[in-house]
Amino acid sequence: QEKREVSTFEEKIALLKEFQKEYNFEQIYTTERNVLGNNVQELRCAVITDTEHFTAGPVKVNVLDRIGTGDSFVAGVLYGINNQYTPQDTINFALSSFALKHTIIGDFQIASKNDVEQFDINNEKVVIKR
């Protein structure tokens, strides 16, 4: 197959919808990261189902460490699926976990479930109490 370039998040979602239909996946999850400079990044994510798609973000974060952020995203997805969250709630929880991990030094997520749930992905000024 020929390689297709995508330049926007919306184009990526459209391509993943085609992929989902072709290979009959129940759900596909994806993330996007835009580097804004000075250790500031904009994050968002999406889930594509067989009938629709859901997005979360963008959220801006000050990055302390990127190691383990993808693992944290997947952990958030699995937590949402295992607890029978809706696709939108799952992707919101996963984005919160993904974004929070960017603020934690080290290769694993130490934020609690409560920290993840309290993270407001719609608010640009987030205070994390530890």
Predicted regions and their residues:
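Conserved post-catalytic alpha-helical subdomain immediately downstream of the catalytic base
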Residues: 57-121
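Conserved phosphate/ATP/ADP-binding segment of small-molecule kinases
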Residues: 1-50
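Generic hydrophobic, helix-prone segments enriched in Leu/Val/Ile
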Residues: 16-19, 116, 126
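Short charge-dense sequence patches
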Residues: 27-29, 47, 67-71, 130
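Glycine/Thr-rich phosphate-binding loops that ligate phosphate moieties of nucleotide
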Residues: 118-130
